[in-house]
Each structure stands twice: as C-alpha cells, then as structure tokens.
Amino acid sequence: MNFHSLYDQGFARVAAVALPVHPARPFENAREIIDAARELDTRGVAMAIFPELCVSGYAIDDLLLQDVLLDNVEKALATIVEASADLLPLLIVGAP
C-alpha cells in the first residue's frame, strides 16, 4: 500500500467544476467539458461533477424544446464520451 496515495487509503478525489457555459452551443460546451476533464485527469480526480444543463446552456428558455438543439446535445454528449473514454474521472454532466 502506498501511504501517500489517497486511493490506497480508501478515499477518492471529487471535483465540482465551474466552467464557462455557452447558451445553445453544445459543441463549444463539450469542448470546455473535455478540456476540463483532461486537466482533472492530470490531477488524479476520480469524479467530476459539472453544472446542470452545462451541455446545452441554461438561459435559453423554450430553445430546450427544439429538436435541432436536442439533436446537437446528443451529438455533443457522444463527443464527450468518446474523448473521455481513456481519462480517469467519471464525468457527470447536465443535459436536457
């Protein structure tokens, strides 16, 4: 057992992430999330929790009901999954 490893001691590093969110721009938000996930991976974070609706943006009212936005959110989520597959942190992101 490595005394200096918090994981060997039964702990996990968890991060609450605040990042710029761009309303109705899911691919730009995905890039922000992926960049943050890569940084957190280098810091040994096991779980990263992102804001609600961080993929779609929050202050867009009825745009959340538009199929074009929802389709792009699904594509952005797939991009996040693919880009983070080899990274340590479990990512919890918000999407409609």
Where are these regions (language model features)?
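Hydrophobic structural segments
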Residues: M1-P96
